[in-house]
Amino acid sequence: MKPESKLWQMVKKNIPDVHWTRLESWAMPGVPDVYGIQEGVSVFVELKVTRSNKINLSPFQQNWLFNHYLNGGRSFIMLQHLDQRLLRVFPSSILHSPLRITSEPQLKVSYTGSAAGDAWARVSEFLLHSPLAEKPEDPPL
């Protein structure tokens, strides 16, 4: 099983109170991997797995996430760091333009050990209820 498929299985298992749907990216390049909804709150999540701190997003993914953010959508990048056994969650607002990624994650949790349940509860709360960043006054083209 591919690493991103394993991460998808972890999300489904550990955040069961959200109605999750895995999206087929070949149908529409750039659309995030996962769509979830709970009590009328919708969220898109791009899943990434790495051994470094780099977020590898295609230009299509960057553009989709950036435009979704500009239109008031709730979308995130979930980065699983294999060596450190950490999840880092970034709001799509870190894409200050379609080609530039900045910022530290707004949520960083360890997903193993005795605190794993609490970590996943924090991830769920962050994805569904964290305040969205304000849009820039003059978004870059």
Regions found by a protein language model. Name each.
Residues 51-62:
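Active-site-adjacent loop/helix micro-motif of nuclease/hydrolase catalytic cores
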